[in-house]
Amino acid sequence: MTVADTKKSVEQKMQKSIEAFKADLAKVRTGRAHTGLLDHVQVDYYGSMVPISQVAAVSLADARTISVQPWEKKMVQAVEKAIRDGDLGLNPATMGDVIRVPMPPLTEERRRELTKVVKGEAEGAKVAVRNLRRDANEQFKKLVKDKAISEDDERRGQDEVQKLTDKFVAEIDKLVAEKEKEIMTV
């Protein structure tokens, strides 16, 4: 394994950490409706738990309302129950075979709590990125010990991985700032 291989591997893993962080951010409810909010809601579909997107069409009715239309009329109650039990604090209302999910406005206190949650998630993502940097640096030390690369190559590799770490940490900070702005916008 060379410095370039290690760097490429670390970059891919760091990118996966960012993607996981983005997925976690999407679950944080803001005042506006978005279909991604219901992505992790699981529905009991004839005895097996499946994502809501597999049993219903999820769309936006307006800026504060999500519309959910189950493909089978029999599934309306199960989908409504899954949304209600989905720990998002949402209260769906059924109108015929369409479920409307209004987004309640967030209180100032709840907004502040959500920004703390986002910062906590960000710190977890940063720790994951830094752990990947540490693993890469240990890999470089091992390569030097095995005489596969020179100490100069090790230093260059560590510098490149540090630049990657800085880049991904900055991206996390940018995502946090955007999410906080979205949460605090009334």
Swiss-Prot record:
Keywords: Cytoplasm, Protein biosynthesis. Pfam families: RRF (PF01765). GO terms for biological process: cytoplasmic translational termination. One of its GO terms (cellular component) is cytosol. GO terms for molecular function: ribosomal large subunit binding. It comes from the Bacteria. SUPFAM superfamilies: Ribosome recycling factor, RRF. It is found in: Cytoplasm. The keyword Cytoplasm applies. The keyword Cytoplasm applies. PANTHER family: MITOCHONDRIAL RIBOSOME RECYCLING FACTOR PSEUDO 1, RIBOSOME RECYCLING FACTOR. Belongs to the RRF family. NCBIfam families: frr (TIGR00496). Responsible for the release of ribosomes from messenger RNA at the termination of protein biosynthesis. May increase the efficiency of translation by recycling ribosomes from one round of translation to another. This is Ribosome-recycling factor. It comes from Cupriavidus metallidurans (strain ATCC 43123 / DSM 2839 / NBRC 102507 / CH34) (Ralstonia metallidurans). The gene is frr.
